[in-house]
Amino acid sequence: GVVDSNDLPLNVSELVSNASDALDKLSSSPCVLVSGKFWDNFGKTZTVEVEDDSAEAKTLSKFLNAALTDKTEEVVRNWKLMNAAELLSEINRLSSSEWQAALR
């Protein structure tokens, strides 16, 4: 769902935005109800994704999608526990191929 900024009060503080009719309607819409706890977690989650059409986008996107609901230290620790060696080899491969292309 998209909320038009004209429908929100000018002073969009947490209390005011929580009391807004537009947000109440959005939070009870069928698409939100279907997704379960999406609305509860919305706003606490930030997603980083690959925004490139290259063949490597799918490979890297599984590593770069991260819910940043934890403290930064916890996110970094979790990233290290993920297949870090595989991620680094992909990044090195991409970097070296792009570097070689740049030298041509």
Swiss-Prot record:
Keyword Plastid assigned: no
Keyword hit for Transmembrane: no
Localization terms from the record: Cytoplasm
Cellular component annotations (GO), alphabetically ordered: cytoplasm
UniProt keyword terms in alphabetical order: ATP-binding, Chaperone, Cytoplasm, Glycoprotein, Nucleotide-binding, Stress response
Quaternary context: Homodimer.
UniProt protein name: Putative heat shock protein PS1
High-level lineage: Eukaryota, Viridiplantae, Streptophyta, Embryophyta, Tracheophyta
